[in-house]
């Protein structure tokens, strides 16, 4: 290939805009149901696969991909990441451990759902939820958690600088 053609191709590649992401807004949505019978908070967290892979790779200091990384290795890294970025503390400050249930992929929607539980013997009222998942990778990340305890419902929204909220149901 002649030198001018190579230079033109290189200039075209460098001048081209970056590939568009599948979505322009970075969000996660969680459903957190308090199960009074088991005294656990049952959480289902939805993230976009590409967003999660990017944040997980930075956190793990190595490239991790849902398609290429062995499932056990990916899940172990995902558990560690979620335990660091999605936490719940009881009203007296005790950290509720994250108990892994599993994950599911919805390829058509580019969605990855994580399922985990957190023991909360005293209930969810007054607990502090800290949710900063993906925020270190995407400054405009918006995370929401829909908390339910029987008939009581509450939605918590977490922005870049607002990563902790207290569960307070209206009377």
Regions found by a protein language model. Name each.
Residues 16-17:
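N-terminal signal peptide c-region/cleavage motif recognized by signal peptidases
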Residues 1-12:
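Bacterial N-terminal signal peptides that target proteins for export
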